[in-house]
């Protein structure tokens, strides 16, 4: 009662899916598989049938048995026809071993009628059986095909009969025709199943015709990529990828829908031209752009030998080995050395002459292609001392370039730029910064030295003045200090004055008049201290 009154699950499935054939007999599916595996694709069946009829007539009338009831018929399979198997004496046996099968047709008269139009349409869409079955099958007349349904019987060939059949049919049988076998290299061609090829393009040695289908020509199938970009992809885009063209995440630059950017020149960083058409290329001997008025300050190095790689054409500081020695370094500091030194491989090929046994920098014909070759190997790795020495040499070269005006100096008025950027900029600070940046930083030390020299010179000058005063007045000058000012008073002069002290008022300049007033004030201070009566009387007379 498990299957609703059915004895087995097979009977239940037959009733469920309305399968008329018994599910116990698994021969139906196997026969169908065998039939479809032996089908050949045919073109122009009318011409093929005519050729077969002509061959059969020439072979003789003894083999023809068109009037007999057990006559062999051409099996034609189409979508409209139905293949029926007899329930009587037909026996189908299959073998596990690889064997050649024979197909035999058996006529059974059935009360069925087919019109001529259905027959003609079925013939055009039919498919033929294997070539080895065609040799044993004869062509029936068109009148007899209308009321005949074929039966197919597959019989296993014994080992003794198999040897005989392979002798006669071995020429036409290929390995791919056998069930369970794969395509062998010994097969004649790949179009063994194709029959009736008239529109041949080329004809090979064996007379094999190659044809092109009209449908393929109309479809214009080609293995070419479309010129447009693939904007939609069949897999999920990686969100971590950044496009170099539009700087957005999710796609690569080759799949970017936007137009590509114009490439920059890596010499002048400008767009619109590349390296070879750059208006300001670098000098071959100094790392400075080559202008119209460029005069190289360094010596030519085309005939100089590098002390590092021992190659001609460059100096030691310009050797490519300096940056190639960092191929294992991932942290700042001296380059990391490999544990085992690398050796050149035995298979060496030249990129100039394409010969085996040497590299491009060792090529005897390199003067034609590359007059200044470079070694691809690393001779030795630098240490800290060598790196520091190289940096010192580079700094000296930079100083030479600055003195000659090759490297542009900073702007003379940097506070103007700062004021434009900062609207609340202080002018005093700007002036101070302008004074500090008025001269290059290299001359700051010289400025300090000049200031110190000026100060020392002023000190020596004052000391010399005091010495002259001491020689003229051995008793020493008398100094008077006024509040808020610190001035050195001149020494008092003796009573007897020489003639050169007396000058006329007309000859005195306005500056000398000011000095005279100061002298009178000093004399007043001196008279208060002196008790000489003679001097007091003399002053009264002058006043």
UniProtKB/Swiss-Prot annotation:
Any single GO CC term annotated in Swiss-Prot or TrEMBL for this entry: nucleolus
Is Metal-binding one of the keywords UniProt gives this record? yes
Q: Where is the composition biased (Basic and acidic residues)?
A: 441-457, 465-475, 503-515
According to its UniProt entry, one GO biological process term is: nuclear polyadenylation-dependent rRNA catabolic process
Q: Mind telling me where the Glycyl lysine isopeptide (Lys-Gly) (interchain with G-Cter in SUMO2) cross-link is?
A: 131, 139, 141, 239, 254, 339, 412, 417, 435, 478, 487, 490, 493, 537
Subcellular localization is given as:
Nucleus, Nucleolus
Report residue spans for region: Disordered.
Answer: 51-71, 414-543
Comp. bias intervals (Basic residues): 493-502
Q: Which UniProt keywords apply?
A: Isopeptide bond, Metal-binding, Nucleus, Phosphoprotein, Repeat, Ubl conjugation, Zinc, Zinc-finger
Organism superkingdom: Eukaryota
Q: Where is the composition biased (Low complexity)?
A: 59-68
Q: Where is the composition biased (Polar residues)?
A: 479-491
Q: What is this protein called?
A: Zinc finger CCHC domain-containing protein 7
SUBUNIT field: Component of a nucleolar TRAMP-like complex, an ATP-dependent exosome regulatory complex consisting of a helicase (MTREX), an oligadenylate polymerase (TENT4B or TENT4A), and a substrate specific RNA-binding factor (ZCCHC7 or ZCCHC8). Several TRAMP-like complexes exist with specific compositions and are associated with nuclear, or nucleolar RNA exosomes.
Pfam families membership: zf-CCHC
**InterPro entries (alphabetical):** TRAMP_AT-DNA-binding, Znf_CCHC, Znf_CCHC_sf
Q: Which SUPFAM superfamilies match?
A: Retrovirus zinc finger-like domains (SSF57756)
Q: Source organism lineage?
A: Eukaryota, Metazoa, Chordata, Craniata, Vertebrata
User: Zn finger regions (CCHC-type) covering which residues?
Assistant: 241-258, 263-280, 304-321, 348-365
A molecular-function term among this protein's GO annotations: zinc ion binding
Q: Which residues carry this modification: Phosphoserine?
A: 482, 485
